[in-house]
Amino acid sequence: MAGAAAFVEADNAEEIMARIETKSQKIESLLKHYKHVEALKTALDGSPPKTLDERCKSANWIVVHRAIMAIKDIEGMLNSLTAEYYDILMKYLYRGLSTGDEPTCEQCLMIHEKLTERAGLGCILRCLSDTTNTV
Amino acid sequence: MAVVDVHRFAESITCHAWSPDLSMVALCPNNTEVHIYKSLSQDHWERLHVLQKHDQIVSGIDWSSKSNKIVTVSHDRNSYVWSLEGAEWVPTLVILRLNRAALCVQWSPKENKFAVGSGAKTVCICYYEQENNWWVSKLIRKRHESSVTSVAWHPNNVLLATTSTDGKCRVFSTFIKGVDTKDSKAGSPAETKFGEQILQLDLSYSWAFGVKWSPSGNTLAYVGHSSMIYFVDDVGPSPLAQSVAFRDLPLRDVLFISEKMVIGVGYDSNPMVFAADDTGIWSFIRYIGEKKAASSGSSYSSQFSEAFGKFYGSQSKSTTANDASDSRGGVHDNSITSIVPLGKGGSPKVMRFSTSALCRMSSPDNNHRNECYISTNLK
């Protein structure tokens, strides 16, 4: 904890890309089975915030985006999401809002409203102030 | 039972400190002066002194309890030590050798030194040189990458914790030959070299504020601007750190009211209580004001919430002044910038504390509370 942060992720960008590939396949299959929440959780898991590689971040974003757009029941989804996911989900929501693409923004805004109710302003704060771990 | 006394001294209070007998309070009403008020009765305060020496806003005040000296630091890069001679406060300039504003100050537990955090990425440790009748400042120039927002002394009078806007909390040794005596059972040689960094904590990704040591010096607590509060137990070669994320707006300052309970104050205008349970896990308990306790969803779960609910369910809050308290249910209208204990420094438990806030109906308030573990009489 103190001092150098342990880089659990492999520094190798290729390895991360490969992992994202397998993740996206898993998510596709989960979505086919209407397991939307599972899909989102899988997408958010292992998000590579510590890599500086833009490609990895973009690749992961595409996967998360897919899962976010598939969500229909927001309340239910947030009910089954545990607290650790709130912060990372919020970061992806802001990334979604920054795209300016209408359906994405609409979906992201709806989730944002509900998520803020649950997680509070602190969650947004953590998103905004964290410039080292961006998504 | 938490009882709150509210006193309005000014539009906005930058910082404040209490006299040793708690009858007087020195505060900066967001200008270049320090006003000292004496309490004549429950609600009646009389302004006794106005200390005017600084050219810019006074950013830190500390009043030593044994030697009865006030130290003030200001954005004008100066510091004055005020001594009461007769009925007047006489200032002594302390040349800090800073080229940026001084942000915070604290007397050491033995009151023979004081530490000043500054925007010049340095910490000044000032001590009194008897031969020259002069306060000398020694700078810790290394390590800090940005402004030092807060300083806190360990009970052993040598270790100093600092927080900075680079997000890190550091512990330094401020051993000064001639002022500090080498403790025979003291730690490593690093602890006896001035300016030596003992520990650096890299828990926060954003600005860090408000560091404090627990009464025994075993635990450190500080806050990050990302609505997080960090607790570090067993500060030393292998510390145990915990990050607690909470729902609402960030905190600015914290106070240990006992070894296992911390009050945080900040942008929510409502002090928050954090406590450690028996296993040593810290978590958010509740707000002090009449506000529904936040869900423990965002902080790691605690078994305490229910127990506290029973004790504080019948809380009655009486305010003496009439503020338009907003929907948050707190007494302050705007963000609270500092929290100061009322009582002898170094005592293991704090029964009362005061908070001061910015702008619009800001006021320091005394908050009396009964510790729920031990039944003691209110002072």
Curated annotation (Swiss-Prot), chain A:
Gene Ontology biological process terms from the UniProt entry: Arp2/3 complex-mediated actin nucleation; regulation of actin filament polymerization
Keywords annotated in UniProt: Actin-binding, Cell projection, Cytoplasm, Cytoskeleton
Record GO cellular component, one term: cytoplasm
Gene3D superfamilies recorded: Actin-related protein 2/3 complex subunit 5
Cellular compartment(s): Cytoplasm, Cytoskeleton; Cell projection
Gene Ontology molecular function, alphabetical: actin binding
Pfam families listed in its UniProt record: P16-Arc
SUPFAM superfamilies recorded: Arp2/3 complex 16 kDa subunit ARPC5
Primary site of residence: cytoplasm
Described purpose of this protein according to its UniProt entry: Functions as a component of the Arp2/3 complex which is involved in regulation of actin polymerization and together with an activating nucleation-promoting factor (NPF) mediates the formation of branched actin networks. Arp2/3 complex plays a critical role in the control of cell morphogenesis via the modulation of cell polarity development.
Subunit structure: Component of the Arp2/3 complex composed of ARP2, ARP3, ARPC1/p41-ARC, ARPC2/p34-ARC, ARPC3/p21-ARC, ARPC4/p20-ARC and ARPC5/p16-ARC.
UniProt family annotation: Belongs to the ARPC5 family.
Name of protein: Actin-related protein 2/3 complex subunit 5B
Species of provenance: Arabidopsis thaliana
Gene: ARPC5B
